[in-house]
């Protein structure tokens, strides 16, 4: 039996992403030459799956087979479980943690301009998408939140570099030239005094 078929069988049976280390252990492979065969087999499987309803993707914890997004409505009919609906506040909180980690609840509140409800943080922790990394060394020692590998896996990302890029904010002076005059005037006045 060829290694590609064995890897595909493992991926089909797995209920989690499988890493190269997992493949080496399960296939009882120890040499670097055989490890390159694993990588080559994965590459070939990825090519084969390009024209199928599922694909082989690399996520933070390894590789997994998943149904392509365009089939999600059909697949959803198999389960009666309704998908988790996240509130705007929950999505904003998760986004802030993903983009600006590690952050405290206070940091999130400063950015959002409103209080973060306890149930929002609890939901994100219960889903396994965020965790406490440590505590900021300030009075009160607030918890520092970061995203987890489960967050990356559930949102089909290999790492946080896969997050969409945030739009760059324009320079305020480009928006209003009067601001440049005011800033320049203030600077001159300060130097003269």
Positions of predicted regions on the chain:
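Phosphate-centric recognition/catalysis
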Residues: 2-3, 153-193
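Short acidic, hydrophobic short linear motifs in intrinsically disordered regions
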Residues: 18-26, 100-111
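Minor-groove-contacting beta-hairpin "wing" of winged helix-turn-helix DNA-binding domains
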Residues: 56-57, 62-66, 137-148
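Short amphipathic alpha-helical interface segments
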Residues: 8-12, 16, 83-103
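Short Lys/Arg-rich amphipathic alpha-helical segments
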Residues: 1-44
């Amino acid at each position: 039996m060829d290694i590609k078929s064995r890897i595909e069988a493992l991926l089909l049976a797995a209920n989690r992403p499988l890493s190269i280390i997992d493949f080496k252990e399960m296939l009882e492979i120890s040499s670097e030459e055989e490890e390159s065969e694993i990588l080559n087999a994965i590459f070939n499987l990825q090519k084969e799956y390009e024209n199928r309803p599922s694909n082989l993707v690399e996520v933070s914890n390894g590789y997994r087979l998943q149904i392509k997004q365009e089939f999600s409505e059909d697949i959803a009919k198999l389960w009666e479980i309704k998908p988790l609906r996240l509130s705007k506040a929950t999505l904003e909180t998760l986004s802030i943690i993903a983009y600006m980690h590690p952050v405290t609840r206070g940091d999130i509140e400063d950015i959002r301009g409103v209080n973060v409800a306890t149930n929002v943080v609890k939901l994100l922790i219960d889903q396994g998408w965020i965790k406490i990394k440590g505590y900021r060394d300030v009075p009160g020692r607030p918890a520092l939140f970061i995203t987890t590998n489960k967050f990356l896996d559930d949102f089909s990302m290999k790492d946080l570099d896969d997050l969409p890029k945030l739009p760059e904010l324009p320079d305020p002076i480009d928006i209003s030239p009067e601001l440049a005059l005011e800033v320049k005037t203030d600077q001159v006045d300060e130097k003269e005094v």
